[in-house]
Amino acid sequence: MALICSISNEVPEHPCVSPVSNHVYERRLIEKYIAENGTDPVNNQPLSEEQLIDIKVAHPIRPRPPSATSIPAILKALQDEWDAVMLHSFTLRQQLQTTRQELSHALYQHDAACRVIARLTKEVTAAREALATLKPQAGLIVPQAVPSSQPNVAGAGESMDLGELAGMTPEIIQKPQDKATVLTTERKKRGKTVPEELVEARGAQQVPGRSPRMWGLHSASIPGILALDLCPSDTNKILTGGADKNVIVFDKSSEQILATLKGHSKKVTSVVFHPSQDLVFSASPDATIRIWSVPNASCVQVVRAHEGSVTGLSLHATGDYLLSSSDDQYWAFSDIQTGRVLTKVTDESSGCALTCAQFHPDGLIFGTGTMDSQIKIWDLKERTNVANFPGHSGPITSIAFSENGYYLATAADDSSVKLWDLRKLKNFKTLQLDNNFEVKSLIFDQSGTYLALGGTDVQIYICKQWTEILHFTEHSGLTTGVAFGHHAKFIASTGMDRSLKFYSL
C-alpha cells in the first residue's frame, strides 16, 4: 500500500511520520508548516522538526501522466528510455576500459615485483655462500698489530679500519735478500746466451688447427676478460679474470676448464699464478685480494689491504709474499700464508692513485705506475722511493721488467711504450704507436728476447733491435692481456670479446 501525504494527498518523495498525530507527511511540506505554525496540521498539537521520524521505503515509481497514453507521447517516452540506456552503456564501457588499464598496470607491477624478489633471493644466496667461505678464514683476515717505525708507512693510526700492520721483521726482510742472491747467481751463470729451445719468430700465424675465435670464456651476458696469467711451471695452465666477477683456470692441452672461482663482488682486474703451489691470486675493485685453491675450487684466504680498488698484483720471487697497488694511493706487501698485511706505503709528496705494480725479477725492488704519468721504483727493504721515471702523458697502464734485470717497459694512455735502463736510470727507447692506440698489457718472455704488448691489437717486438716482428688483429674487441708460453712456443691473448686466443711465432 502506498503512503499518502496528509497535506498534499500525493505519494511523498521523502515520507516522515508525526508522533503527535501518527500521520504521514511529505517532509518538505511539514517542515514549512512547522516553521510557520509550530503545530501538527491534523490535531494542532505542538510539533518540532526534531520529532519527525523518517520512513525508509523504496523509491516510489510515479504513475505515468495521462499525456503518456497517446502514441506520440509513448514514442517520446521510448526514445528517452533508449537515450538513457545508451548513456548508461557508454558509461559502463568507459568504466570497463579504466578497470582493464588498472588491471594491466597491476599485473606489470606484480611481474616486476616477482623479478626483484627472484634477484634478491639469488643475491642473498650468493652472499650466504660467500659468508660461509669467509667464516673459516675470519681469524686470518684482519692482521695483528705490530707497530711500524717508518713515518710514511701506514701504521696503527693510519690503517683505515683495515687492521694494524704485522710489520717487517728481520726474518721477513732477510728472506727476499737470500732469494735475490740465488737468482742473481743463476742469471750470471746463464749469461747472455739464449736458450736453444727458444722459438725464433718466422711470421704471424695462429696455432694450427685452431679456430680464429678460439675459446670463449666467462659470461656471455657480461662479456670481457680483463686479466691473464700463465702458470710458470706449466704454461698449458691459463688463468683469467673476467668482468663477470669470476676467475677461471683453463687447461690448454685438454681444452677443459679446471676451476671456476667465484667470490668477488666486482669485476676481476688482476690475476697471478703461484709457480710451485696449486694456488692462484686475484684482485678486484671490491678492495679485496683473494687466494684460491685450484684443486678445491675454493677461496682459502682474503687479504684486505686497501680501502679502494686494487689495481695491481705481483707475486714475489720467494712465492711467499704479494705486492698490491690501489687507487687509495698505497702499495701493500702481504704474507700469503697468514693473510696479514705486513706493510703499507704511500708517497706523501705526490698523493696520487696507483694504477699498477710489478716486482723486479730479483725481488729487491719493484715498480708502480701512477695516475699522474709517473713510474716509481721502490726499495722493498727500506720501503722508500729510490727512482722516478717521468716522460709519459696520461695514466700508466702497464709496466714489465725484463728477466735480464736491466730493462723496464712502461705504457700509458699516450699511445707509446717507453724502455728504461735500470742501470743508468734513463729512457733509451720509445716505441711510438699509432694515434689512439691503447696499450693495456706488457710482458717480456722468460729469456728477455721478445716484448709483447696488447691493447688495440697484439704486437710482438724483438728486444735490442726493438723492431716489430709480429702483429695480430684477431680480437674483435680491446686486447686486455698477453703472455708467452714456455720458450715462447706460443703467445696467449685475451680480450673484451671474452675470447682466449693462442698464436705461434
Swiss-Prot record:
WD repeats: 220-260, 263-302, 305-346, 349-388, 391-430, 434-473, 474-505
E.C. number: 2.3.2.27
U-box domain boundaries: 1-73
Swiss-Prot/TrEMBL catalytic activity: S-ubiquitinyl-[E2 ubiquitin-conjugating enzyme]-L-cysteine + [acceptor protein]-L-lysine = [E2 ubiquitin-conjugating enzyme]-L-cysteine + N(6)-ubiquitinyl-[acceptor protein]-L-lysine
PROSITE patterns found in the cross-reference section: U_BOX (PS51698), WD_REPEATS_1 (PS00678), WD_REPEATS_2 (PS50082), WD_REPEATS_REGION (PS50294)
The name this protein goes by in its record: Pre-mRNA-processing factor 19
GO biological process: DNA repair; mRNA splicing, via spliceosome; protein K63-linked ubiquitination
Domain of life of the native organism: Eukaryota
Family recorded in the similarity comment: Belongs to the WD repeat PRP19 family.
The organism of origin for this protein: Gallus gallus
CC terms in the record's Gene Ontology section: cytoplasm; lipid droplet; nucleoplasm; nucleus; Prp19 complex; spindle; U2-type catalytic step 1 spliceosome
